[in-house]
Amino acid sequence: MDVVNQLVAGGQFRVVKEPLGFVKVLQWVFAIFAFATCGSYTGELRLSVECANKTESALNIEVEFEYPFRLHQVYFDAPSCVKGGTTKIFLVGDYSSSAEFFVTVAVFAFLYSMGALATYIFLQNKYRENNKGPMMDFLATAVFAFMWLVSSSAWAKGLSDVKMATDPENIIKEMPMCRQTGNTCKELRDPVTSGLNTSVVFGFLNLVLWVGNLWFVFKETGWAAPFMRAPPGAPEKQPAPGDAYGDAGYGQGPGGYGPQDSYGPQGGYQPDYGQPASGGGGYGPQGDYGQQGYGQQGAPTSFSNQM
């Protein structure tokens, strides 16, 4: 009991509410319906043979058949209408292969769904370890989807043949006494095959479930990551018109307005306003505008002379 309690306490039951676990529950339930409706079937048909000699007639002949539908082994006794004798009439066909294949796939799908669901709940860490669990789950799901397609299609064809072989009208056509003049053969009851029809429906529903579950298992494998495109990034912001002068702004390094050593550290116009060119710019303590001027090479000596 302690082990059971620990498993229950450590179980991640929320996975049942997620698509991966919820679909697995549906697969488990639908697999039960598929093999139960087919594997437990028992059918019966009735017919009558009325001979010219009324005393030899059989007015209620019951013929039973069941899964796995080896109809060639099913027979019934019918009056031969000749001197009180009877004749064994065998049904035609062996449809056990398609029926047994369908039931086998359903049973294994039931067992796998139950095991996978238990793994999702109680062994989630082991399931995701090294990504082997999702990959094996995906391959198994793909195989079962294919097997459901094949088995359901084969059983649908087999069921059609079973209906033909158990139709009282077709059986009567093969009975020799019914072809004799004076004898009358009638069908009294057709077999009820609604349960078998339901099994075919559940087979194709299982096919839909297993094919649909491929996507949810595929996402768990991580194989979808290369195909998942990242959302486009935000467009690059264009600089505002005011930023054309540079990021530094006024008076802050290159690109700004500021007084960067007058107009440059070397050459060009250097307003020294009262100091020699080698002493740097500025107003300086030596005189006013008229002293030293711009320089010594043929330029005006002061602002007053230029005026």
Swiss-Prot record:
Modified residues (Phosphothreonine): T221
Chain spans, region Disordered: 233-307
GO biological process: endocytosis; modulation of chemical synaptic transmission; regulation of long-term neuronal synaptic plasticity; regulation of neuronal synaptic plasticity; regulation of opioid receptor signaling pathway; regulation of short-term neuronal synaptic plasticity; regulation of synaptic vesicle priming; response to amyloid-beta
Entry-annotated residues carrying Phosphotyrosine: Y75, Y273, Y289
Annotated ranges, domain MARVEL: 15-222
Topology Vesicular: residue spans: 44-101, 157-194
PROSITE patterns named among the record's database cross-references: MARVEL, SYNAPTOP
Localisation per UniProt entry: Cytoplasmic vesicle, Secretory vesicle, Synaptic vesicle membrane; Synapse, Synaptosome
Biased composition (Gly residues): 248-258, 277-296
Tissue distribution: Expressed in the brain with expression in the cerebrum and the cerebellum.
Signal sequence, start to end: none
Major location (coarse): membrane
GO molecular function, a single term: cholesterol binding
Residue ranges that the UniProt entry lists as topological domain Cytoplasmic: 1-19, 126-132, 219-307
UniProt-annotated stretches for the region Repeats, Gly-rich: 249-298
Sequence similarity: Belongs to the synaptophysin/synaptobrevin family.
Comment field on protein domains: The calcium-binding activity is thought to be localized in the cytoplasmic tail of the protein.
Name of the protein this chain belongs to: Synaptophysin
Organism of origin: Rattus norvegicus (Rat)
Source lineage: Eukaryota, Metazoa, Chordata, Craniata, Vertebrata
Gene from which this protein is expressed: Syp
